[in-house]
């Protein structure tokens, strides 16, 4: 009996021990499974985006990490260098891992060629690049950004990346970063050699996104300069001919002040984007971030920022009902035109100005569009000349009061200031500069005039050089909108006239919209619009209508000639009846393979 009891007791213990062991195994399996699921998530299935040179947003959208192509949705982990930090990063829900690469024992007697994960001044690490990549590739789908702190680490690291890619193991975007130019406030040169860095990438691992940056210094309590036009242009020149996608890392606290340069930079190629980063103690302004957000496409800017700035910014940025502030020198996209949208979407509007005794009252348009202001000059009895708008009844309205009246409305507008007499140019620009400084110009602004230059010199019009010089000196943050004198257009826009206008605008950093009359354009060489648009990535053409001596057929030939070249970069300053007919005609013939300059079949309003 005692034996049975002993055996029974022993059996019970083994059963209990077995149950506990099974429970423990199941628990461990579940934890490992959940961890592995958290790390891997759905795999990347589309070969077009599952590659080192893929667009980061396309990749993250493909694997279900983001819902649409918006750099604000991407999350980052900084300095995932040591094995402890790497594990923490891998177990987090961030989308892109950022880590620093140098060589072991950098600049000491113990230096080797082994790439390790460390940020200066550290020159040793418990993690080599090879170990880091093995861990990241085996247990996550996270994007990779490698920041190279020394040129010596670049070659061996790219060799390793190439080997892993050729083995089919790197199926995600890889960004290769280095600071290759001396930037703001830096007293000594510490940057990686630009020529050698870019050459190594082309030679050893060209299938990646390049992230070339500036060395920077920012001290909150001291005066700080920002990125200059020369810096930005030098950087763009270095990467212009490269085939890769390029994302420029820019210090967020300095970016708003240099926005005119970055607006220009982003317009130079669809391959370009910015990655805004924040130093640990940088006082980044949410207002500045919102301005940058408002004046760029969502896919053009990544935001690598600290809390609480990131959450505060994201909450406001994703609020679709907030009032936005646009850069005066920026594009009509997205203010009035959708990205890649038809320029015909943009409507030119006129203010309704009513005479009331000696004063004029404004009735603002009830819809969004480009507001055309024809500006002259009034010589007061005392004081400086004042730029004004004149009414049919003889009253005058100052340009400043008009713009202030428009600024209080929430409607999206852009402003086209058309200078009608030479003496009004600089006073008008001074008014624009003053209001912009006060924050009363929250939209894109065009400044245009009929210019006199070369073979189209006509007395009474603004000298072409004076228009560009005045803009550069008084208020450069505008789109320049030059037109040819009507007196010279009897035979259309002849090649010499187009060539001379392009010569006049050579070196212009502002966007330019060449103003073309529809009638004369219909009599011009077929390549006229194409030549003007080829002037720069920011060049556009505005076709306008003048009733003076133009046949109906010539007008519509001009409109269709412009549409045949490019529908996103051509605008139409034409009367409402023409615009309605053109819209209706476009709708009736969409889609159409007949897009040549001569395709004017069935002019609106014309019997066939």
Swiss-Prot record:
One Gene Ontology cellular component annotation held by this UniProt entry: membrane
Subcellular localization(s) per the UniProt record: Membrane
Keywords on record: Membrane, Transmembrane, Transmembrane helix
Annotated signal peptide: none
Transmembrane segments: 14-34
Pfam families: Menorin
InterPro entries, per the entry: Memorin
Positions of the UniProt region annotated as Disordered: 588-608
Major site of localization recorded for this protein: membrane
Protein's membrane topology: Single-pass membrane protein
PANTHER family per record: MENORIN (DENDRITIC BRANCHING PROTEIN), PROTEIN FAM151A
Similarity-based family: Belongs to the menorin family.
Protein name: Protein FAM151A
Encoding gene, per UniProt annotation: Fam151a
């Amino acid at each position: 009996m005692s034996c049975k009891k002993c055996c029974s007791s022993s059996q019970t213990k083994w059963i209990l021990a077995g149950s506990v062991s099974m429970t423990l195994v199941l628990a461990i399996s579940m934890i490992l499974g959940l961890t592995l699921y958290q790390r891997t998530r759905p795999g990347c299935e589309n070969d077009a985006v599952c590659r080192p040179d893929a667009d980061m947003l396309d990749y993250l959208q493909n694997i279900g990490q983001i819902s649409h192509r918006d750099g604000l949705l991407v999350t980052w982990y900084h300095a995932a260098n040591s094995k402890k930090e790497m594990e923490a990063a891998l177990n987090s829900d961030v989308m892109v891992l950022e880590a620093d690469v140098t060589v072991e024992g950098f600049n000491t007697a113990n230096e080797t060629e082994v790439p390790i994960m460390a940020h200066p001044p550290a020159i040793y690490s418990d993690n080599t690049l090879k170990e880091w990549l093995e861990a990241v590739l085996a247990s996550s789908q996270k994007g990779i950004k490698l920041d190279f702190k020394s040129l010596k680490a670049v070659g061996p690291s790219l060799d390793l990346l190439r080997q892993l890619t050729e083995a089919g193991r790197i199926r995600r975007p890889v960004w290769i970063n280095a600071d290759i130019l001396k930037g703001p406030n830096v007293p000594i040169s510490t940057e990686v050699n630009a020529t050698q860095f870019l050459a190594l990438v082309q030679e050893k691992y060209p299938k990646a996104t390049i992230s070339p940056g500036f060395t920077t210094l920012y001290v909150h309590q001291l005066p700080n300069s920002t990125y200059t036009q020369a810096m930005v242009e030098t950087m763009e020149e270095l990467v212009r001919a490269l085939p890769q996608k390029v994302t420029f890392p820019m210090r967020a606290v300095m970016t708003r002040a240099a926005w005119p340069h970055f607006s220009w930079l982003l317009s130079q190629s669809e391959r370009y984007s910015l990655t805004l980063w924040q130093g640990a103690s940088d006082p980044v302004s949410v207002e500045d971030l919102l301005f940058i957000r408002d004046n760029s496409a969502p896919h053009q800017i990544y935001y690598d920022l600290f809390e609480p700035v990131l959450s505060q910014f994201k909450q406001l940025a994703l609020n679709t009902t907030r009032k936005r502030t646009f850069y005066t020198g920026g594009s009509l996209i997205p203010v009035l035109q959708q990205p890649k949208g038809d320029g015909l979407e943009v409507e030119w509007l006129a203010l309704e100005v009513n005479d009331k005794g000696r004063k004029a009252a404004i009735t603002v348009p009830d819809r969004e569009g480009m507001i055309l202001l024809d500006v002259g000059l009034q010589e007061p009895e005392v004081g400086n000349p004042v730029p004004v708008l004149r009414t049919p009844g003889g009253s005058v309205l100052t340009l400043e009061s008009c713009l202030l009246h428009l600024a209080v409305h929430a409607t999206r507008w852009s402003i086209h200031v058309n200078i009608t007499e030479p003496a009004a140019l600089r006073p008008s620009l001074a008014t624009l500069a003053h209001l912009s400084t006060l924050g009363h110009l929250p939209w894109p602004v065009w400044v245009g005039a009929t210019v006199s230059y070369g073979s189209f010199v006509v007395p009474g019009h603004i000298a072409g050089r004076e228009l560009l010089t005045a803009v550069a000196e008084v208020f450069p943050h505008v789109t320049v909108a030059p037109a040819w004198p009507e007196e010279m257009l009897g035979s259309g826009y002849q090649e010499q006239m187009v060539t001379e206008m392009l010569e006049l605008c050579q070196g212009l950093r502002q966007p330019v919209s060449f103003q073309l009359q529809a009638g004369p354009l219909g009599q011009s060489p077929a390549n006229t619009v194409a030549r003007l648009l080829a002037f720069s990535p920011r060049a556009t053409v505005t076709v306008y209508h003048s009733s003076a001596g133009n046949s109906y057929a010539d007008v519509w030939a001009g409109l269709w000639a412009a549409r045949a070249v490019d529908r996103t970069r051509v605008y139409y300053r034409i009367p409402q009846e023409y615009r309605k007919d053109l819209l209706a005609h476009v709708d009736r013939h969409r889609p159409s393979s007949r897009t040549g300059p001569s395709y004017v079949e069935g002019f609106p309003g014309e019997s066939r």
